[in-house]
Amino acid sequence: PALLFQWMEHAEPPGWTSLKPADISAQRTLHIEALNLRVVLDQLFTAHVAGHNPKTTTEHALGRPISWTLASSRLGHSERGTLLIENQYAPLHAAAALGPIAQNAVELIQSVDPARLRRCAAHLCLRWFVDTSKGGRRGWCSMATCGNRAKAARYRARQERDTAEA
């Protein structure tokens, strides 16, 4: 749960400040809901990339955190005066902070070419990303983390191989 809370503090989803769980039971519930959402998002993205509609169970599980949060939307204006839709969140409990994540995932698959949505190629990474590279060949969620680790591992393997051959 500590890493989840660090991420939540950084991401600041609507309602998080007022609903951050203080007791252990609520923290565990939020952690379990976040892990469940991660599995559901993986299923959603996998289906999207394969050109399939998500399973009904995936849709139901994705709809749960969305239903906990979204109270209403209204038309507003940006700082430049252009129209935009403002979502007014009314979170019911701490796990409701996961609702905007689920909503953004649905909006993402509506707007992204399935060929550009990728799972990170790093063995232990669970992240998905949108490949915006010119050639469409990006394999890592982040070159600073996963890509760098892969390059370092290849370098170490070459060094060990060269040492063994010498």
Residue ranges and their predicted role:
Residues 1-119, 164-166:
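Short helix-coil boundary/hinge micro-motifs
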Residues 96-154, 160-166:
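BZIP DNA-binding basic region
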